Regions:
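Conserved ATP-binding/catalytic motifs of P-loop helicase motor domains
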Residues: 1-108
């Protein structure tokens, strides 16, 4: 799969801004977007941003509970440094099987 790691600094507002930019970039490529939040707090924080209101935002647990990957889409992982090894392998395996682009943000 296509994989990129996007590193950046900043608190919750900075993370939302970075996420909105990545979503816009993926949309400009004609891709559907799925967002995986680091935890429930981040998930709620992202859902409050109007720019992300139409996006599917799930938690990391969804990876291990059978996340459905949309072929040809983009999956954006918030705070990717918090993924476990098993979650990372599940993500990359699913992405490879469904030709999914993966963008992982690293909050530094």
């Amino acid at each position: 799969p296509s994989l990129a790691i996007v590193s950046g600094q900043g608190g919750a507002a900075g993370q939302r801004e970075r996420m909105a930019e990545l979503v816009m970039m993926a949309r400009e490529q004609g891709r559907e977007v799925q967002i995986i939040a680091a935890d429930r707090r981040s998930q709620m924080n992202l859902k409050q941003d109007e720019r992300l209101s139409g996006e599917l935002i799930t938690g990391r647990r969804q990876l291990l509970e059978g996340m459905a990957f949309t072929p040809g889409s983009t999956v954006i992982v918030d705070q990717g440094e918090k993924l476990s090894l098993k979650e990372t392998l599940t993500l990359l395996d699913g992405a490879a099987r469904h030709n999914v682009q993966v963008l992982i943000t690293d909050s530094g």
